[in-house]
UniProtKB/Swiss-Prot annotation:
It comes from the Eukaryota. GO terms for biological process: tRNA threonylcarbamoyladenosine metabolic process; tRNA threonylcarbamoyladenosine modification. ATP binds at residues 26-34, 48. Its EC number is 3.6.-.-, 2.7.11.1. GO terms for cellular component: chromosome, telomeric region; cytosol; EKC/KEOPS complex; nucleus. This is EKC/KEOPS complex subunit SPAP27G11.07c. Transmembrane segments: none annotated. Component of the EKC/KEOPS complex composed of at least SPAP27G11.07c/BUD32, cgi121, gon7, pgp2 and SPAC4H3.13/PCC1; the whole complex dimerizes. This protein is considered an atypical serine/threonine kinase, because it lacks the conventional structural elements necessary for the substrate recognition as well as a lysine residue that in all other serine/threonine kinases participates in the catalytic event. BUD32 has protein kinase activity in vitro, but in the context of the EKC/KEOPS complex, the catalytic subunit KAE1 switches the activity of BUD32 from kinase into ATPase. It comes from Schizosaccharomyces pombe (strain 972 / ATCC 24843) (Fission yeast). Belongs to the protein kinase superfamily. BUD32 family. Residues 20-238 form the Protein kinase domain.
Amino acid sequence: MSEKPDLRQRCSDIYREIKEKKLTVVKQGAEAITIKTEFYPGEVCLLKCRPAKRWRHPILDQKLSRKRCLVEARLLAKCHYVGIKCPMLYFIDANRGQIYMEWIDGPCVRDYIREICECEIEKKLIPLMKRIGSEVAKMHKNDIVHGDLTTSNMMLESHNNPVPIFIDFGLGSVSESEEDKAVDIYVLERALSSTLPESESLFHHVLDSYAQSWKQSKATLRRFEEVRMRGRKRTMIG
């Protein structure tokens, strides 16, 4: 009979290490905590932890956490294999719900867009939108669905080299579903409009580049229009 997971110990270990080592908590969400730490001395990395959920049965919690860790690690590996920029996977401890990965030092796309003045939009943002469109097309062509494709989940190598790096595949999956891919695009559209209210013309560049980069994307783009209409109806109804 398998040993019952020590739920409290798993929770306290993470928080004690954060406190004692004075690590930098980058983000704390409902499912995971991301921490800036070192993989080995001098090598900065990002540690993503999935703390135990006290309200969930310990064995079920560990199984779900392990599954999500493995799915995310496989998505990162698949992205690298097909040439999509994302953090390099260093190490995974699925039983503890932890993934060590490359630290990306550049700004996130959300912050980069907000810093751009109106006179620089054509010069800086249009090329970035086209690049995002082509990279998302590459993702979907290879049946990679991000699951939370927002401007906060895209980093840049630097301000001077605005190449998108996709992060946080915690809600991602491998899926052939046109619906899943269409929802990815819709989430991106909503995120762009939230980041930059006058983003409609910019998003056209994302869609154009997506269509040009993936010749079999017509069905997904048709489904995107359906998803978009459903979203607008929900907004109108409230």
